A protein has these predicted regions:
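Catalytic binding pocket for nucleotide-activated donors in carbohydrate/polymer assembly enzymes
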Residues: 176-222
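Short, charged/polar "capping" segments at the starts of alpha-helices
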Residues: 22, 44, 59-60, 103-105, ...
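C-terminal alpha-helical cap of glycosyltransferases
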Residues: 246-262
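Acidic donor-binding loop of glycosyltransferase active sites
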Residues: 163-175
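Donor-nucleotide binding loops and adjacent catalytic segments primarily
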Residues: 89-165
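A nucleotide-sugar donor-handling region in carbohydrate enzymes
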Residues: 47-105, 136
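A short, well-ordered alpha-helix in the C-terminal region of glycosyltransferases
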Residues: 226, 233-247
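Active-site and donor-binding regions of nucleotide-sugar-utilizing enzymes
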Residues: 1-64
């Protein structure tokens, strides 16, 4: 990678990879005028000009940008937000999504929780699955056998699904910020250990279950049921979401990048 970058001689290098090594960033600084890292908590992050760490808690790192202010929300969400009519009074439809791949199959864990709860089985679920999800046949068979009210959406943009959901059950990734932008109260489950470092859910008071690989199913059932049953809690969350500075992340990032000395 370094030899290719040297041949290009760019004015800026943006690293969208995790845990960059210090040596790599030092070498980049010899080549490029500006080095920007994304979601980097490795040793190299301290040497970059800017680190866009929206998903992590602010730890005071001098060159890092934290929080929803710097999260770039895709245009599709901006286009679909006008269709949001959030009513905290009733819950009818629950959106479930754990990314495009869900390698740990947290989706099936949540479906088993729903199937084992007479209360949760009464609701309708929109299950958003990505192109790399490998357990579609298992999901289809399970939902049919257990007579779950599930509408499976394959490769469907979440921006078009969130306006029609009353609550969501989501992985603890950038989707949490997208749900916040769409004013969608959500139950959050970390799909792996690294996602446990993402703490934005605390700021808006989204119910959090923990690491999906470790938590008991009872915790998931409790958190989902709590959000469905407590309309005051949902209204409280929506109020928190309405007060966020979110949606202009690209403009804020551009402003920060322009301050990097040449």
């Amino acid at each position: 990678a370094l030899s290719l970058i040297k041949s290009i001689k760019p004015d800026m290098v943006i690293n969208d990879c995790l845990d960059n090594e210090a040596f790599y960033i030092r070498e980049l600084k010899k080549i490029s005028l500006k080095v920007i890292n994304i979601e980097d908590i490795g040793e190299g992050s301290f040497l970059a000009d800017k680190v866009i760490n929206c998903v992590y808690s602010d730890c005071g790192q001098h060159n890092a940008l934290y929080g929803e202010k710097y999260m770039d929300i895709r245009d599709a969400f901006h286009r679909n937000k006008p269709f949001v009519q959030r009513d905290s009074e009733f819950v009818k439809n629950v959106l479930v999504n754990f990314g495009g791949e869900d390698p740990n199959n947290i989706t099936m864990k949540v479906l088993r929780v729903i199937a084992n709860s007479d209360y949760l089985k009464t609701f309708h679920y929109t299950l958003a699955l990505g192109s790399r999800y490998r357990s579609l046949n298992e999901v289809e068979a399970f939902t049919k056998i257990n007579r779950l009210k599930v509408d499976i959406k394959l490769n469907t943009d979440l921006a078009t699904l969130m306006p029609h959901a009353d609550i969501a059950v989501l992985a603890n990734c950038r989707t949490v910020f997208e749900a916040a932008f769409m004013l969608l109260p959500s139950v959050i489950i970390s799909a792996n250990a690294r996602e446990c470092l993402h703490t934005f859910y605390r700021k808006v008071d989204f119910p959090y279950c923990g690491n999906g690989l470790l938590i008991n199913n009872d915790i998931i059932e409790h958190k989902i049921s709590q959000l469905i049953l407590d309309k005051e809690y949902r209204a409280h969350i929506i109020k928190n979401l309405e007060q966020l500075e979110i949606g202009q992340g690209l403009a804020h990032l551009e402003s920060e990048i322009m301050t990097i000395p040449r």
